[in-house]
Design a protein with these regions (language model features):
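Positively charged n-region of N-terminal signal peptides that target proteins for export
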Residues: 1-6
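A beta-strand edge to alpha-helix "cap/lid" segment located at domain peripheries
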Residues: 9-17, 24-56, 63-153
């Protein structure tokens, strides 16, 4: 098969015109993976009481609410983790979904944990909504709200 300059020009024009359609889709996939990694880093940092990682992942404007409506800013959130008396035996974030919306990501998952305080084991299963924001090249946790699940969940 012989390709002419005209054939190559047509292919080139097509390739260049398709780039704006392909690149955002690929960027979304890269961003989803980066957010997924940030969520996993947050889970591990909560378990390990890793203050440096928590400081890095949380946005300065963080609004963190618990299922009992208790609200914390970045400082209170990190201090609560660092001074907690309960020991997490496990913490998982199953049913993770991520939706990229510009420089924001909407993350939903369950919070499934087992913790122990004064010899008493507590199992927790709640729903969580997180909003992550891309600040520079990093994803930061901007907001988090948790909620009680229906009895059947």
């Amino acid at each position: 098969m012989n390709l002419t300059r005209r054939d190559l020009a047509v292919v080139g024009v097509f390739a260049l015109s398709a780039t704006p359609l392909i690149v955002p889709a690929m960027a979304g996939t890269d961003d989803e993976e980066a957010v997924k990694q940030a969520v996993e880093a947050l889970r591990k940092a909560i378990l390990a009481q890793d203050k440096a990682t928590l400081e890095t992942l949380a946005a300065e404007q963080l609004s963190y609410s618990h299922s009992d409506a208790h609200l914390e800013d970045k400082t209170k959130f990190i201090n609560a983790i660092m001074t907690r008396r309960a020991v997490f035996k496990s913490l998982e974030f199953p049913e993770l979904t991520i939706a990229i919306a510009g420089n924001n990501a909407i993350v939903r998952h369950l919070w499934v944990s087992e913790s122990e305080l004064d010899g008493k084991v507590t199992n927790t299963k709640i729903g969580v909504l997180q909003v992550w924001q891309k600040q520079g090249s990093s994803w930061k946790l901007l907001a988090r709200a948790s909620f009680k699940l229906p009895e059947s969940a």
